[in-house]
Amino acid sequence: MVCEKCEKKLGRVITPDTWKDGARNTTESGGRKLNENKMLTSKKARFDPYGKSGFATCRICKSSVHQSGSHYCQGCAYKKGICAMCGKKVIDTKNYKQTSV
């Protein structure tokens, strides 16, 4: 659950740049340099799931949050009726019997 204010942050489309702007075969865009040893530099660009990333832990259940910029996981946000990103109350869950299963 995300409020209307935080929904604008999610509205970005995750697509690569156009070919000329972010082409991989140019050195100015951060691509590989000429005669670069790929074995030495590939360790920095590799994805590390347990390392320091943009994902935090949920403030309620302390589990991993699967959305960057969020403070609450989707299960806790649904149960409490709050926004997963900012924690603002979205719906009143007083008369609901909600489960996250």
Curated annotation (Swiss-Prot):
One of its GO terms (cellular component) is dendrite. It is found in: Cytoplasm. GO terms for molecular function: microtubule binding. Keywords: Cytoplasm, mRNA processing, mRNA splicing, Spliceosome. GO terms for biological process: cytoplasmic microtubule organization; mRNA processing; RNA splicing. Pfam families: Cript (PF10235). It comes from the Eukaryota. InterPro entries: PDZ-binding_CRIPT. As a component of the minor spliceosome, involved in the splicing of U12-type introns in pre-mRNAs. Belongs to the CRIPT family. Component of the minor spliceosome, which splices U12-type introns. This is Cysteine-rich PDZ-binding protein.
